[in-house]
Amino acid sequence: DFAVMENEYGAVNVDGDLLEQTNDLNIWELTEGCICCSMQNDFATSILTIANTVDPEYLIVEPTGVGMLSKIIENIQKIEYERITLLEPLTILDGTMYDRCMFEFSEICEDQIQSAGRILVSKMEYAAENERCSLKQKLIALNPEAEICVSHYTEQGDDWWASLLTSYLDKEIPMKEERELDLENLGLTEASLQSEQELILFLQGVVSGVFG
């Protein structure tokens, strides 16, 4: 049982429309913002909502191409518990645009490569062997731990595709350490939340057992 969450940095989600036409899937769309920053509260709320209502075995998140993958992983890890577990992130890279993207958007491009567990290179099936090898070496230099596939996706066997659903993320994204207070009880005055979305996220976390 699969559900798909699409995040497009714009008002129109073309990929979501195509998926709805060709597959019997639950499609969730988040547009006009990026789930790694401006929409991170909506993103976390949506994941908890999907987990508690649709309850799919797998939720595929396709973020916008201008998103920071490390931030997206961090946002999910904040709400991760026994029913929400991260698989290895897969970055799909347009091999023909690599040099241009690294020149114009180096921070985003490097983050998406370095945070991935697997990197699948697209649009290089007609490139010369030395070009593919050169690109692979550049990717290895940025992320030596990732599995890098420069051959066309149709050349990947069934075992490879199946392993996408069984390979779990085994590395933590560094987060700021918070000092624990050695108190039996804690009282807060004038506590507030910035939005209704934050309240919904907090309440869903309580119901789901995220806080113990």
Predicted regions and their residues:
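Conserved short-loop catalytic and cofactor-binding motifs
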Residues: T31, I60, K123, L186-G187
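Phenylalanine-focused residue identity feature
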Residues: F2, F43, F103-F105, F202, ...
